[in-house]
């Protein structure tokens, strides 16, 4: 894998910011409704909030490059690739005034592997020696964490793992203050119970309408530009844009369903479009009585007109999928064409299998409702009934984790360009259970495992191509739909407005008061 590493070393609020000279920035987004503990969720909305408070040893910046944050340098790796020595920066404090030491890093990883935590991302780090013993309840300490002194430690892993350093740069490995986190217990990540070394601290959080943040007086890095950062929760995409037009928020995402309405409006110069690394797909519960039949899954794929979906419902802001892996991720097979659309063939596949009018339910969040409704119409033409139900985002997250969704529509985005981060995390059999898809193919698992343990980038690419083909074209274990583009709007006075790969990094935002 070629990893690019950077060098280390309401409207009333808006008017008040102008009158008082204070810089107040209000960002509108949907409510993730999963809390802000990044060990227990994979929600990008939660990341966009917690990202301002928490920091890890490393991070992926807006330019998709990994850089040092709490670590002084990139790790020193042993010749056998199994030991990583990391030194922390000295003088770093958490926002509560406590010093960052090796003990906090140790606590963070041990909390991650403690079963009671319910960490959703252990598969990214469970190659650390002793992690599985903790997950199995056989140990309470992480044997692969070796403390050298207050600022230096070693991580021992069981096998060579090419993306290990890359994974250390993800939000899921944010470092927590041991004393404060332990004291908060189950309330960690709820309300204002989130303390980090990041540039902001949470002043208010009612978990329903908004999160208010102010600068961290103990921050070790460059002073932030804002006096106040507000994350305003607005679930309805049309309401969100109305609030933006009325000046009640300064920046928000622009849902693709509304792009046609705004692209030639007075706001056209305030729209920025980006192409992330992810894939949108119809996620299927592969052990469901109806959907466990491969013929049904194949017929579903054949019935969907992806090109039309992209040009009409998505207003041209997407490309029809040809594999589960995004074209920007090594392992995507550029030789593959868009998945076939053939209603007649879909009907024949069902007939050959002796299946008549298969029926299932697709439960989605409000933002995916239009996509699901379009899919419903396509499937109906092939004699497949897909009932669509729109449910609360919080209920959706819980139902997906519990394996209670027959199907749903969502996007899955790696935070850096590596297939392990996009495909292993969702469809490796042990992880597929937690994602509610229950895909299980030993051949696929074997290819993914071999790719994980190889440091040969060319070999990894070929292994991922084979795995993707098995997943999405042989088994139809997932139904890739399209590679979407994302849009956001920002007022002319907002400076440094950028979207990383799905995550809004708001800590660099500034306000030009002279333009308000």
Residues covered by each model-derived region:
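N-terminal lobe/hinge region of extracytoplasmic solute-binding protein
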Residues: 28-79, 195
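Gly/Pro-rich hinge or "lid" segments in bacterial periplasmic/extracellular proteins
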Residues: 157-223, 228
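Ligand-site clamp/hinge motif
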Residues: 185, 216-262, 385
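Extracytoplasmic/peripheral linker and loop segments enriched in polar/acidic and small residues
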Residues: 75, 387-389, 393-396, 401, ...
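Long beta-strand-rich cores associated with HINT superfamily self-processing modules
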Residues: 488-516
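Append "and occasionally in soluble cytosolic enzymes with long acidic Gly/Pro-rich linkers
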Residues: 292-377, 381-382, 387, 466, ...
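Surface-exposed binding/hinge segments that line
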Residues: 87, 106, 122-179
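Alpha-helical secondary-structure segments
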Residues: 101-108, 150-156, 198-199, 226-228, ...
């Amino acid at each position: 894998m070629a990893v690019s590493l950077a060098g280390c070393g309401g409207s009333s609020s808006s008017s008040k910011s102008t009158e008082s000279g204070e810089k107040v920035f209000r960002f509108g987004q949907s409510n993730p409704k999963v809390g802000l503990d990044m060990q227990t969720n994979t929600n990008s909305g939660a990341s966009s909030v917690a990202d301002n408070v928490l920091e890890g040893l490393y991070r992926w910046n807006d330019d998709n490059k990994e850089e040092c944050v709490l670590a002084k340098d990139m790790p020193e790796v042993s010749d056998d690739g199994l030991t990583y020595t990391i030194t922390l920066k000295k003088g770093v404090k958490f926002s509560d005034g406590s010093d960052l030491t090796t003990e906090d890093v140790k606590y963070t990883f041990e909390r991650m592997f403690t079963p009671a935590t319910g960490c959703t991302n252990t598969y990214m780090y469970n190659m650390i020696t002793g992690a599985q013993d903790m997950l199995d309840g056989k140990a309470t300490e992480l044997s692969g964490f070796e403390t050298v002194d207050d600022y230096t430690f070693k991580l021992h892993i069981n096998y060579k793992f090419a993306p290990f350093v890359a994974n250390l740069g993800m939000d899921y490995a944010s470092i927590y203050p041991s004393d404060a986190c332990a004291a908060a217990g189950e309330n960690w990540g709820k309300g204002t119970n989130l303390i980090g070394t990041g540039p902001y601290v949470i002043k208010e959080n009612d978990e329903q309408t908004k999160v208010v943040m102010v600068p961290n007086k103990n921050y070790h890095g460059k002073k932030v530009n804002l006096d106040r950062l507000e994350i305003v929760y607005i679930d309805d995409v049309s309401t969100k844009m109305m609030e933006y037009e009325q000046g009640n928020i300064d920046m928000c995402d622009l849902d693709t369903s509304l792009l046609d309405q705004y692209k030639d409006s007075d706001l056209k110069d305030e729209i920025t479009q980006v192409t992330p690394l992810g894939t949108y797909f119809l996620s299927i519960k592969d052990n469901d009585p109806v959907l466990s039949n491969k013929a049904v899954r194949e017929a579903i794929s054949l019935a969907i007109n992806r090109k039309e979906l992209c040009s009409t419902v998505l207003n041209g802001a997407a490309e029809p999928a040809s594999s589960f892996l995004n074209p920007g991720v090594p392992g995507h097979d550029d030789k593959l064409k868009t998945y076939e659309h053939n209603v007649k063939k879909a009907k024949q596949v069902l007939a050959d299998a002796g299946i008549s009018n298969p029926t299932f339910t697709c439960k989605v969040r409000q933002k995916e409702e239009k996509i699901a409704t379009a899919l419903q119409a396509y499937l109906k033409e092939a004699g497949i009934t897909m009932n669509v139900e729109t449910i609360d985002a919080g209920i959706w997250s819980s139902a997906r984790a519990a394996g209670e969704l027959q199907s749903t529509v969502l996007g899955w985005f790696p935070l850096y360009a590596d297939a392990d981060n996009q495909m292993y995390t969702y469809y490796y059999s042990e992880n597929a259970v937690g994602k509610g898809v229950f895909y299980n193919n030993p051949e696929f698992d074997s290819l993914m495992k071999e790719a994980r343990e190889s440091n040969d980038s060319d070999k990894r690419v070929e292994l991922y191509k084979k795995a993707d083909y098995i997943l999405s074209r042989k088994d139809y274990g997932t139904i890739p739909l399209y590679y979407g583009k994302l849009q956001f709007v920002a007022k002319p006075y907002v400076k440094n407005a950028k979207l990383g790969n799905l995550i809004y990094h708001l800590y660099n935002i500034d306000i030009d008061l002279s333009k308000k």
